[in-house]
Amino acid sequence: MKEVMSVNETVREALAIALLKLMKSQEFAKIAVSDIVRVAGVGRSSFYRNFDSKEDLICSYITELYRERFESREIPVRLYGSGNIEEFLTPRFNFIKEHEDIFKTLHRQNMLYNFFIMIENDIVPILCGHN
């Protein structure tokens, strides 16, 4: 069960949800920080206290979801020597499926690259046989 979020965590999540909502109807490049904070119902200073850019916001949000998913459970963070590749990859594909709406939005915005860069250090060594 997730612990109670701090006010700052709540603000960060509200900003991310607002950005994702806007991304469903607008091009990412045309979304202004003022649009995000308006939809999130927070002040502009809240955005800049937490993030350097819109890209930072979306990447931070997905990173946090990813960390929550994989640090809170007994899921292999890395696959070493005797590990099973299915045990490693299946939870990651399930993560994408569980957050399908986010990933579809990222895909429509041509931003999936950001997610794959984030998990690159996990998956590339496995795919190259260097576990």
Segments from the language model and where they lie:
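N-terminal intrinsically disordered/low-complexity leader segments
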Residues: M1-N8
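Alpha-helical structural segments
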Residues: E13-K21, V39, D56-P76, E87, ...
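Helix-turn-helix
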Residues: L22-D56
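Short, hydrophobic secondary-structure boundary micro-motifs
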Residues: I31-A32, K104-L106, F115
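Short linear capping/connector segments at secondary-structure termini
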Residues: E74-R78, L106-L112
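Amphipathic alpha-helical packing segments from all-alpha helical-bundle domains
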Residues: N110-N131
